[in-house]
Amino acid sequence: MTDRRNLTTNQGVPIGDNQNSMTAGLKGPTLLEDYVLIEKLAHFDRERVPERVVHARGAGAHGKFVTKKSMKKYTKAQFLQEEGTETEVFARFSTVIHGQHSPETLRDPRGFSVKFYTEEGNYDFVGNNLPVFFIRDAIKFPDVIHSLKPDPRTNIQDGNRYWDFFSLTPEATTMITYLFSDEGTPASYREIRGSSVHAFKWINEEGKTVYVKLRWVPKAGIVNLSTDQAAQIQAKEFNHASRDLYEAIENGDYPEWDLYVQVLDPKDLDNYDFNPLDATKDWFEDVFPYEHVGTMTLNRNPDNIFAETESVGFNPGVLVPGMLPSEDRVLQGRLFSYSDTQRHRVGPNYLQLPINSPKTPVDNNQRDGQMPFKQQTSSINYEPNSYDTEPKENPAYIEPEQEIRGDISGRLVAEKPNNFGHAKEVWKRYSDAERAALVKNIVDDWEGVREDIKIRNLRNFYQVEPEFAERVAAGTGINLAEHVIDLK
Protein backbone atom coordinates (compact mmCIF):
# COMPACT_ATOMS: atom_id res chain seq x y z
CA MET A 1 0.00 0.00 0.00
CA THR A 2 1.44 3.36 -1.00
CA ASP A 3 1.44 6.42 1.24
CA ARG A 4 -1.47 8.73 0.58
CA ARG A 5 -0.46 11.90 -1.27
CA ASN A 6 -1.67 15.16 0.23
CA LEU A 7 -3.18 17.83 -2.00
CA THR A 8 -1.18 21.00 -1.22
CA THR A 9 -0.91 24.68 -1.99
CA ASN A 10 2.02 25.88 -4.08
CA GLN A 11 3.70 26.63 -0.75
CA GLY A 12 3.56 22.92 0.09
CA VAL A 13 0.93 23.27 2.81
CA PRO A 14 -1.65 20.41 2.88
CA ILE A 15 -5.20 21.36 1.87
CA GLY A 16 -8.03 20.04 4.01
CA ASP A 17 -11.00 21.07 1.84
CA ASN A 18 -10.74 21.82 -1.87
CA GLN A 19 -14.51 21.86 -2.46
CA ASN A 20 -15.73 24.79 -0.36
CA SER A 21 -14.49 28.38 0.01
CA MET A 22 -14.19 29.98 3.44
CA THR A 23 -17.26 32.13 4.12
CA ALA A 24 -18.71 34.26 6.93
CA GLY A 25 -21.33 31.72 7.91
CA LEU A 26 -23.62 29.67 5.66
CA LYS A 27 -25.09 32.69 3.88
CA GLY A 28 -22.26 35.18 4.24
CA PRO A 29 -19.68 36.41 1.70
CA THR A 30 -16.44 34.65 0.83
CA LEU A 31 -13.47 35.65 2.98
CA LEU A 32 -10.39 37.32 1.50
CA GLU A 33 -8.28 35.40 4.02
CA ASP A 34 -8.96 32.14 2.13
CA TYR A 35 -5.40 31.64 0.87
CA VAL A 36 -6.24 28.38 -0.91
CA LEU A 37 -8.98 30.07 -2.97
CA ILE A 38 -6.94 33.19 -3.77
CA GLU A 39 -3.84 31.23 -4.79
CA LYS A 40 -5.89 28.86 -6.95
CA LEU A 41 -7.73 31.64 -8.80
CA ALA A 42 -4.65 33.84 -9.17
CA HIS A 43 -2.65 31.00 -10.68
CA PHE A 44 -5.51 30.08 -13.00
CA ASP A 45 -5.62 33.69 -14.22
CA ARG A 46 -1.99 33.35 -15.31
CA GLU A 47 -1.95 29.82 -16.73
CA ARG A 48 -1.59 30.92 -20.33
CA VAL A 49 1.20 32.85 -22.00
CA PRO A 50 0.67 34.84 -25.22
CA GLU A 51 0.30 32.43 -28.11
CA ARG A 52 2.78 32.55 -30.94
CA VAL A 53 1.95 35.31 -33.43
CA VAL A 54 2.50 32.67 -36.12
CA HIS A 55 2.64 28.88 -35.75
CA ALA A 56 0.37 28.98 -32.69
CA ARG A 57 -1.37 25.69 -33.48
CA GLY A 58 1.15 22.90 -33.09
CA ALA A 59 1.97 19.35 -32.05
CA GLY A 60 5.32 18.03 -30.89
CA ALA A 61 7.23 14.86 -30.08
CA HIS A 62 10.60 13.68 -28.82
CA GLY A 63 12.90 11.42 -30.76
CA LYS A 64 16.36 10.81 -32.11
CA PHE A 65 18.38 11.65 -35.19
CA VAL A 66 20.92 9.14 -36.47
CA THR A 67 23.66 10.31 -38.83
CA LYS A 68 23.80 7.85 -41.73
CA LYS A 69 26.53 9.50 -43.80
CA SER A 70 29.43 11.61 -42.61
CA MET A 71 29.18 15.26 -43.64
CA LYS A 72 32.75 16.11 -42.63
CA LYS A 73 33.64 17.17 -46.17
CA TYR A 74 31.05 19.95 -45.82
CA THR A 75 30.84 20.81 -42.11
CA LYS A 76 32.77 20.38 -38.88
CA ALA A 77 29.53 20.09 -36.84
CA GLN A 78 30.34 17.23 -34.49
CA PHE A 79 27.01 15.43 -34.66
CA LEU A 80 27.42 15.05 -38.43
CA GLN A 81 30.98 13.70 -38.44
CA GLU A 82 30.51 9.97 -37.88
CA GLU A 83 27.98 7.49 -39.20
CA GLY A 84 25.84 6.10 -36.39
CA THR A 85 25.99 9.19 -34.16
CA GLU A 86 22.69 9.57 -32.30
CA THR A 87 21.36 12.99 -31.30
CA GLU A 88 18.31 13.62 -29.14
CA VAL A 89 15.69 15.84 -30.83
CA PHE A 90 12.35 17.50 -30.20
CA ALA A 91 10.19 18.25 -33.25
CA ARG A 92 7.22 20.61 -33.51
CA PHE A 93 4.80 20.72 -36.44
CA SER A 94 2.33 23.55 -36.83
CA THR A 95 -0.07 25.55 -38.92
CA VAL A 96 0.99 29.15 -39.51
CA ILE A 97 -1.76 31.74 -39.60
CA HIS A 98 -4.63 30.78 -37.33
CA GLY A 99 -4.91 30.51 -33.55
CA GLN A 100 -4.02 27.79 -31.12
CA HIS A 101 -7.26 25.80 -31.35
CA SER A 102 -8.04 26.37 -35.03
CA PRO A 103 -8.79 23.44 -37.38
CA GLU A 104 -5.77 21.56 -38.68
CA THR A 105 -7.52 21.13 -42.04
CA LEU A 106 -7.17 24.78 -43.09
CA ARG A 107 -5.11 25.72 -46.14
CA ASP A 108 -1.84 26.92 -44.67
CA PRO A 109 1.88 26.18 -44.79
CA ARG A 110 2.93 23.70 -42.10
CA GLY A 111 5.79 24.56 -39.81
CA PHE A 112 8.46 21.87 -39.48
CA SER A 113 10.96 22.62 -36.70
CA VAL A 114 13.49 20.35 -34.99
CA LYS A 115 15.66 21.10 -31.97
CA PHE A 116 18.85 18.99 -31.94
CA TYR A 117 20.46 18.63 -28.50
CA THR A 118 24.02 18.13 -29.76
CA GLU A 119 27.28 17.69 -27.87
CA GLU A 120 28.24 21.24 -28.94
CA GLY A 121 24.99 22.86 -27.81
CA ASN A 122 21.60 23.23 -29.41
CA TYR A 123 21.00 23.39 -33.15
CA ASP A 124 17.58 24.53 -34.39
CA PHE A 125 16.19 23.55 -37.77
CA VAL A 126 13.28 25.95 -38.41
CA GLY A 127 11.47 25.26 -41.66
CA ASN A 128 8.17 24.60 -43.42
CA ASN A 129 6.68 21.82 -45.48
CA LEU A 130 6.66 24.09 -48.55
CA PRO A 131 10.10 24.86 -50.03
CA VAL A 132 9.71 28.61 -50.63
CA PHE A 133 8.18 31.64 -48.92
CA PHE A 134 5.89 34.53 -49.91
CA ILE A 135 8.51 37.29 -49.72
CA ARG A 136 12.24 37.80 -50.21
CA ASP A 137 12.86 40.54 -47.62
CA ALA A 138 12.02 40.42 -43.90
CA ILE A 139 10.80 44.02 -43.96
CA LYS A 140 7.62 42.66 -45.60
CA PHE A 141 7.07 39.87 -43.08
CA PRO A 142 4.62 41.76 -40.82
CA ASP A 143 2.66 42.81 -43.91
CA VAL A 144 2.22 39.37 -45.43
CA ILE A 145 1.17 37.95 -42.07
CA HIS A 146 -1.22 40.85 -41.43
CA SER A 147 -2.82 40.25 -44.83
CA LEU A 148 -3.38 36.57 -44.03
CA LYS A 149 -4.56 37.13 -40.46
CA PRO A 150 -8.21 37.99 -39.74
CA ASP A 151 -9.39 41.51 -40.57
CA PRO A 152 -8.77 43.59 -37.40
CA ARG A 153 -12.26 45.07 -37.70
CA THR A 154 -14.28 41.89 -38.27
CA ASN A 155 -11.88 39.24 -36.88
CA ILE A 156 -12.61 37.21 -40.03
CA GLN A 157 -10.00 36.11 -42.57
CA ASP A 158 -10.77 37.87 -45.85
CA GLY A 159 -9.50 36.73 -49.24
CA ASN A 160 -9.65 40.31 -50.49
CA ARG A 161 -6.84 41.15 -48.09
CA TYR A 162 -4.30 38.46 -48.90
CA TRP A 163 -5.08 38.24 -52.62
CA ASP A 164 -4.68 42.03 -52.78
CA PHE A 165 -1.25 41.65 -51.17
CA PHE A 166 -0.31 38.74 -53.46
CA SER A 167 -1.39 40.62 -56.60
CA LEU A 168 0.95 43.49 -55.72
CA THR A 169 3.77 41.17 -54.59
CA PRO A 170 4.63 39.12 -57.68
CA GLU A 171 7.47 37.39 -55.82
CA ALA A 172 4.73 35.49 -53.92
CA THR A 173 3.57 33.71 -57.08
CA THR A 174 5.73 30.61 -56.64
CA MET A 175 4.47 30.18 -53.08
CA ILE A 176 0.90 30.43 -54.39
CA THR A 177 1.52 27.52 -56.77
CA TYR A 178 2.54 25.38 -53.79
CA LEU A 179 0.09 26.65 -51.17
CA PHE A 180 -2.98 26.31 -53.39
CA SER A 181 -2.01 22.85 -54.53
CA ASP A 182 -3.29 20.02 -52.37
CA GLU A 183 0.00 20.22 -50.46
CA GLY A 184 -1.55 23.24 -48.73
CA THR A 185 -3.87 20.78 -46.95
CA PRO A 186 -1.71 17.85 -45.78
CA ALA A 187 -3.34 14.64 -44.59
CA SER A 188 -1.22 14.49 -41.42
CA TYR A 189 1.99 15.74 -39.85
CA ARG A 190 3.53 12.28 -40.34
CA GLU A 191 3.13 12.64 -44.10
CA ILE A 192 4.61 16.08 -44.78
CA ARG A 193 8.01 16.93 -46.14
CA GLY A 194 10.19 19.61 -44.59
CA SER A 195 12.42 22.29 -46.08
CA SER A 196 14.85 24.78 -44.60
CA VAL A 197 13.43 27.30 -47.14
CA HIS A 198 16.60 29.35 -46.68
CA ALA A 199 20.12 28.49 -47.67
CA PHE A 200 22.68 28.24 -44.88
CA LYS A 201 26.46 27.99 -44.87
CA TRP A 202 28.35 24.90 -43.81
CA ILE A 203 32.09 25.16 -43.06
CA ASN A 204 34.44 22.20 -42.74
CA GLU A 205 37.64 21.80 -40.69
CA GLU A 206 39.71 23.28 -43.52
CA GLY A 207 37.56 26.42 -43.53
CA LYS A 208 35.92 25.71 -46.89
CA THR A 209 32.39 27.15 -47.09
CA VAL A 210 29.46 25.80 -49.08
CA TYR A 211 25.83 26.90 -49.25
CA VAL A 212 23.28 24.25 -48.33
CA LYS A 213 19.55 23.67 -48.16
CA LEU A 214 18.10 20.89 -46.04
CA ARG A 215 15.13 18.66 -46.87
CA TRP A 216 13.15 16.19 -44.78
CA VAL A 217 11.42 13.37 -46.69
CA PRO A 218 8.81 11.32 -44.78
CA LYS A 219 9.25 7.56 -44.98
CA ALA A 220 5.45 7.30 -44.95
CA GLY A 221 5.32 9.30 -48.18
CA ILE A 222 3.74 12.70 -48.83
CA VAL A 223 -0.05 12.47 -48.53
CA ASN A 224 -2.39 15.41 -49.05
CA LEU A 225 -6.11 16.13 -48.87
CA SER A 226 -8.32 17.64 -51.52
CA THR A 227 -10.37 20.65 -50.47
CA ASP A 228 -13.45 18.44 -50.26
CA GLN A 229 -11.69 15.83 -48.14
CA ALA A 230 -10.40 18.52 -45.78
CA ALA A 231 -13.91 19.93 -45.42
CA GLN A 232 -15.31 16.50 -44.58
CA ILE A 233 -12.71 15.98 -41.85
CA GLN A 234 -13.20 19.49 -40.48
CA ALA A 235 -16.93 18.86 -40.07
CA LYS A 236 -16.08 16.15 -37.54
CA GLU A 237 -12.63 16.87 -36.15
CA PHE A 238 -10.51 19.98 -35.52
CA ASN A 239 -7.48 18.04 -34.27
CA HIS A 240 -6.98 15.31 -36.84
CA ALA A 241 -3.25 15.91 -37.39
CA SER A 242 -2.37 16.21 -33.69
CA ARG A 243 -4.45 13.14 -32.88
CA ASP A 244 -2.86 11.15 -35.69
CA LEU A 245 0.69 11.99 -34.55
CA TYR A 246 -0.04 11.29 -30.89
CA GLU A 247 -1.83 7.99 -31.50
CA ALA A 248 0.79 6.72 -33.95
CA ILE A 249 3.56 7.25 -31.40
CA GLU A 250 1.51 5.80 -28.54
CA ASN A 251 0.89 2.70 -30.67
CA GLY A 252 4.57 2.27 -31.52
CA ASP A 253 4.14 3.33 -35.14
CA TYR A 254 7.01 5.79 -34.95
CA PRO A 255 7.14 8.32 -37.81
CA GLU A 256 10.46 8.72 -39.61
CA TRP A 257 11.99 11.26 -41.96
CA ASP A 258 15.19 11.07 -43.97
CA LEU A 259 17.27 14.26 -43.98
CA TYR A 260 18.96 15.32 -47.20
CA VAL A 261 21.32 18.17 -48.00
CA GLN A 262 21.70 20.10 -51.25
CA VAL A 263 25.05 21.78 -51.80
CA LEU A 264 26.07 24.86 -53.78
CA ASP A 265 29.66 26.03 -54.16
CA PRO A 266 29.84 29.82 -53.57
CA LYS A 267 31.77 30.25 -56.82
CA ASP A 268 28.66 29.05 -58.68
CA LEU A 269 26.28 31.47 -57.00
CA ASP A 270 25.98 33.69 -60.08
CA ASN A 271 25.53 30.86 -62.58
CA TYR A 272 21.73 30.92 -62.47
CA ASP A 273 18.99 33.19 -63.76
CA PHE A 274 17.82 33.65 -60.17
CA ASN A 275 19.45 34.36 -56.82
CA PRO A 276 19.83 31.02 -54.98
CA LEU A 277 19.75 32.92 -51.67
CA ASP A 278 16.25 34.27 -52.39
CA ALA A 279 13.63 32.61 -50.14
CA THR A 280 11.05 32.74 -52.95
CA LYS A 281 13.18 30.39 -55.06
CA ASP A 282 13.39 26.61 -54.87
CA TRP A 283 16.45 24.45 -55.42
CA PHE A 284 15.01 21.73 -57.65
CA GLU A 285 16.44 18.28 -57.00
CA ASP A 286 17.46 17.65 -60.62
CA VAL A 287 19.61 20.80 -60.49
CA PHE A 288 20.84 20.48 -56.90
CA PRO A 289 21.01 16.74 -56.11
CA TYR A 290 20.00 15.40 -52.70
CA GLU A 291 22.64 13.77 -50.48
CA HIS A 292 21.42 11.62 -47.61
CA VAL A 293 22.48 12.86 -44.18
CA GLY A 294 20.51 10.81 -41.65
CA THR A 295 17.16 9.73 -40.26
CA MET A 296 14.89 11.19 -37.59
CA THR A 297 12.55 8.94 -35.62
CA LEU A 298 9.92 10.39 -33.27
CA ASN A 299 9.26 7.87 -30.51
CA ARG A 300 7.91 9.65 -27.43
CA ASN A 301 4.99 12.00 -26.87
CA PRO A 302 5.32 15.01 -24.56
CA ASP A 303 4.41 14.50 -20.90
CA ASN A 304 3.07 18.05 -20.69
CA ILE A 305 2.00 19.95 -23.80
CA PHE A 306 2.35 23.38 -22.20
CA ALA A 307 5.80 22.72 -20.75
CA GLU A 308 7.12 21.21 -23.96
CA THR A 309 5.21 21.82 -27.20
CA GLU A 310 3.94 25.26 -26.17
CA SER A 311 7.08 26.44 -24.37
CA VAL A 312 9.68 25.26 -26.86
CA GLY A 313 11.36 28.11 -28.71
CA PHE A 314 13.20 27.93 -32.02
CA ASN A 315 15.47 30.32 -33.90
CA PRO A 316 17.15 29.59 -37.27
CA GLY A 317 20.22 31.40 -35.93
CA VAL A 318 20.77 28.76 -33.22
CA LEU A 319 23.63 26.97 -34.96
CA VAL A 320 26.62 24.91 -33.87
CA PRO A 321 30.25 25.33 -35.02
CA GLY A 322 30.47 24.48 -38.70
CA MET A 323 27.25 26.29 -39.58
CA LEU A 324 26.44 29.93 -40.35
CA PRO A 325 23.41 31.78 -41.73
CA SER A 326 23.45 32.85 -45.36
CA GLU A 327 22.74 36.33 -46.69
CA ASP A 328 19.08 35.47 -47.40
CA ARG A 329 17.18 38.67 -46.50
CA VAL A 330 14.23 36.90 -44.90
CA LEU A 331 16.53 34.69 -42.86
CA GLN A 332 18.49 37.72 -41.66
CA GLY A 333 15.31 39.17 -40.15
CA ARG A 334 14.28 35.87 -38.59
CA LEU A 335 17.61 35.66 -36.76
CA PHE A 336 16.43 38.51 -34.54
CA SER A 337 12.69 38.03 -34.53
CA TYR A 338 12.40 34.42 -33.42
CA SER A 339 14.25 34.66 -30.10
CA ASP A 340 12.76 38.09 -29.51
CA THR A 341 9.23 36.70 -29.67
CA GLN A 342 10.12 33.91 -27.20
CA ARG A 343 11.47 36.45 -24.72
CA HIS A 344 8.19 38.35 -25.03
CA ARG A 345 5.99 35.27 -25.01
CA VAL A 346 7.65 33.02 -22.43
CA GLY A 347 10.14 35.31 -20.69
CA PRO A 348 13.78 36.40 -20.73
CA ASN A 349 14.90 33.09 -19.21
CA TYR A 350 12.98 30.85 -21.62
CA LEU A 351 16.23 29.04 -22.45
CA GLN A 352 16.34 27.72 -18.87
CA LEU A 353 13.16 25.72 -19.39
CA PRO A 354 14.01 22.00 -19.72
CA ILE A 355 12.66 21.74 -23.28
CA ASN A 356 14.94 24.60 -24.41
CA SER A 357 18.02 23.85 -22.31
CA PRO A 358 21.03 22.33 -24.05
CA LYS A 359 22.44 19.06 -22.75
CA THR A 360 25.85 20.73 -22.61
CA PRO A 361 26.87 23.04 -19.72
CA VAL A 362 25.88 26.72 -19.92
CA ASP A 363 28.58 28.93 -18.44
CA ASN A 364 28.42 32.71 -18.91
CA ASN A 365 27.52 35.96 -17.16
CA GLN A 366 23.92 36.30 -18.34
CA ARG A 367 21.97 36.47 -15.10
CA ASP A 368 18.83 37.42 -13.26
CA GLY A 369 15.68 38.62 -15.04
CA GLN A 370 12.27 37.09 -14.40
CA MET A 371 12.29 33.52 -13.04
CA PRO A 372 16.04 32.67 -13.19
CA PHE A 373 15.63 29.19 -11.72
CA LYS A 374 19.08 28.03 -12.87
CA GLN A 375 20.97 30.93 -11.35
CA GLN A 376 24.76 30.81 -11.61
CA THR A 377 26.49 31.35 -8.28
CA SER A 378 29.98 32.70 -8.93
CA SER A 379 30.64 36.21 -7.62
CA ILE A 380 32.65 36.96 -10.77
CA ASN A 381 29.96 38.04 -13.22
CA TYR A 382 32.10 40.01 -15.65
CA GLU A 383 34.60 39.21 -18.38
CA PRO A 384 37.52 39.62 -18.98
CA ASN A 385 38.72 38.79 -15.49
CA SER A 386 41.90 37.43 -13.92
CA TYR A 387 40.38 34.35 -12.27
CA ASP A 388 41.46 31.01 -13.71
CA THR A 389 38.41 29.33 -12.19
CA GLU A 390 36.05 31.28 -14.44
CA PRO A 391 35.00 30.37 -18.00
CA LYS A 392 37.21 31.78 -20.74
CA GLU A 393 36.65 32.41 -24.43
CA ASN A 394 38.09 29.74 -26.73
CA PRO A 395 39.66 31.03 -29.98
CA ALA A 396 39.13 27.60 -31.56
CA TYR A 397 35.46 28.52 -31.94
CA ILE A 398 35.86 31.90 -33.64
CA GLU A 399 33.60 31.98 -36.70
CA PRO A 400 35.69 31.77 -39.88
CA GLU A 401 35.92 34.93 -41.95
CA GLN A 402 33.38 35.10 -44.75
CA GLU A 403 33.50 37.05 -48.00
CA ILE A 404 31.03 39.94 -48.19
CA ARG A 405 29.40 40.49 -51.58
CA GLY A 406 28.71 44.18 -52.08
CA ASP A 407 30.55 47.46 -51.71
CA ILE A 408 27.72 49.90 -50.94
CA SER A 409 24.98 50.00 -48.34
CA GLY A 410 21.42 51.16 -48.85
CA ARG A 411 17.89 49.93 -49.49
CA LEU A 412 18.87 48.03 -52.60
CA VAL A 413 16.41 46.09 -54.74
CA ALA A 414 17.23 42.39 -54.83
CA GLU A 415 19.10 41.20 -57.92
CA LYS A 416 17.64 38.71 -60.40
CA PRO A 417 14.07 38.83 -59.03
CA ASN A 418 12.77 36.44 -61.72
CA ASN A 419 9.36 36.48 -60.04
CA PHE A 420 7.66 34.00 -62.35
CA GLY A 421 10.37 31.62 -63.57
CA HIS A 422 10.16 29.19 -60.66
CA ALA A 423 6.37 29.23 -60.62
CA LYS A 424 6.58 28.22 -64.29
CA GLU A 425 8.86 25.33 -63.36
CA VAL A 426 6.43 24.19 -60.67
CA TRP A 427 3.52 24.33 -63.13
CA LYS A 428 5.51 22.32 -65.69
CA ARG A 429 6.37 19.66 -63.12
CA TYR A 430 2.79 19.23 -61.92
CA SER A 431 0.71 16.37 -63.33
CA ASP A 432 -2.61 17.09 -65.03
CA ALA A 433 -4.40 16.21 -61.78
CA GLU A 434 -2.17 18.55 -59.76
CA ARG A 435 -2.76 21.41 -62.21
CA ALA A 436 -6.50 20.84 -62.04
CA ALA A 437 -6.41 20.88 -58.23
CA LEU A 438 -4.38 24.11 -58.19
CA VAL A 439 -6.83 25.85 -60.52
CA LYS A 440 -9.89 24.58 -58.63
CA ASN A 441 -8.49 25.61 -55.25
CA ILE A 442 -7.74 29.16 -56.45
CA VAL A 443 -11.14 29.52 -58.12
CA ASP A 444 -12.90 28.31 -54.96
CA ASP A 445 -10.86 30.68 -52.81
CA TRP A 446 -11.72 33.64 -55.04
CA GLU A 447 -15.40 33.54 -54.11
CA GLY A 448 -16.15 37.02 -52.77
CA VAL A 449 -12.83 38.51 -53.94
CA ARG A 450 -13.07 41.81 -55.87
CA GLU A 451 -12.70 41.52 -59.65
CA ASP A 452 -9.87 44.06 -59.88
CA ILE A 453 -7.85 41.97 -57.41
CA LYS A 454 -8.55 38.82 -59.42
CA ILE A 455 -7.41 40.52 -62.63
CA ARG A 456 -4.11 41.64 -61.11
CA ASN A 457 -3.44 38.08 -59.96
CA LEU A 458 -4.42 36.70 -63.37
CA ARG A 459 -1.86 38.98 -64.98
CA ASN A 460 0.77 37.45 -62.68
CA PHE A 461 -0.41 33.93 -63.52
CA TYR A 462 -0.29 34.77 -67.23
CA GLN A 463 3.40 35.63 -66.88
CA VAL A 464 3.93 32.23 -65.29
CA GLU A 465 2.11 30.32 -68.04
CA PRO A 466 -0.78 31.56 -70.20
CA GLU A 467 -2.63 28.26 -69.73
CA PHE A 468 -2.53 28.70 -65.95
CA ALA A 469 -4.19 32.12 -66.17
CA GLU A 470 -6.66 31.00 -68.84
CA ARG A 471 -7.91 28.09 -66.75
CA VAL A 472 -8.33 30.20 -63.61
CA ALA A 473 -10.06 32.95 -65.61
CA ALA A 474 -12.42 30.43 -67.18
CA GLY A 475 -13.36 29.19 -63.74
CA THR A 476 -14.23 32.70 -62.60
CA GLY A 477 -15.97 33.94 -65.74
CA ILE A 478 -13.41 36.66 -66.50
CA ASN A 479 -12.50 37.51 -70.10
CA LEU A 480 -8.74 37.23 -69.73
CA ALA A 481 -7.75 38.39 -73.23
CA GLU A 482 -8.73 42.02 -72.70
CA HIS A 483 -6.61 42.25 -69.54
CA VAL A 484 -3.31 40.81 -70.84
CA ILE A 485 -2.94 42.51 -74.23
CA ASP A 486 0.17 44.36 -73.07
CA LEU A 487 1.75 41.10 -71.86
CA LYS A 488 1.59 39.26 -75.20
Swiss-Prot record:
The active site is at residues 55, 128. It catalyses: 2 H2O2 = O2 + 2 H2O. CDD domains: catalase_clade_1. Keywords: Cytoplasm, Heme, Hydrogen peroxide, Iron, Metal-binding, Oxidoreductase, Peroxidase. Its EC number is 1.11.1.6. It is an enzyme of class 1 (oxidoreductase). One of its GO terms (biological process) is response to hydrogen peroxide. InterPro entries: Catalase, Catalase_AS, Catalase_clade1/3, Catalase_core, Catalase_haem_BS, Catalase_immune_responsive, Catalase_sf. Coiled coil: none annotated. Residues 1-24 are annotated as: Disordered. Its cofactor is heme. GO terms for cellular component: cytoplasm. Heme binds at residue 338. Residues 7-23 have a biased composition (Polar residues). One of its GO terms (molecular function) is metal ion binding. Decomposes hydrogen peroxide into water and oxygen; serves to protect cells from the toxic effects of hydrogen peroxide. This is Catalase. It comes from Listeria seeligeri.
